[in-house]
Amino acid sequence: MTGAPGSRWSGFVNDCLYTRPDVDTSDQSPNREYWAHGDLMHKGAYFDPSFEFMNSPESEWDKPFSGTGYRVIKSHTFAFMLDRLKEHGHDMYLIHRPDDECYEWWHTAGGWDITYPDYRRYYWDNDGMKDQIRLQNKHILDFVKQEGLEGYDDGKRTIYRWRPPTNTRKNLTETG
């Protein structure tokens, strides 16, 4: 799962993936939640440089989980490694919103006051955040074009799904 900060990917995950009975939600705990305006905005582990877990598939994906089923691995910076991630054979969701909408929503959701995950050490300041949103969105859209993916606009964001060939499919982030 990838999307730039402010892409509203957490809402998609909460509404469409965490509600499935076959999804492992054992990564969720009170210290991995962020609430704003009375709404639960973030829950579960996030994988990115300077976050609690790094985005390295080889060593980090299993760390926050103890259950079974499909695992939702969320990383903003997966946008930079989509071709490499294809080789793992898992379904991937890519969430996109225009750069300015991402930036505005991220600030509306709490911006630098977001307590989980902590964006300050990787994105640094507003200019750094704008640059990263632009770069992450560019990489996502380049991959979408390269793979010929069609998106679904749910009124909040555009959702793309990449699926590996059926003989290599592991779906979401199934272990094993």
Task: Report the location of each language-model feature.
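PAPS-dependent sulfotransferase catalytic domain
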Residues: V72-T175
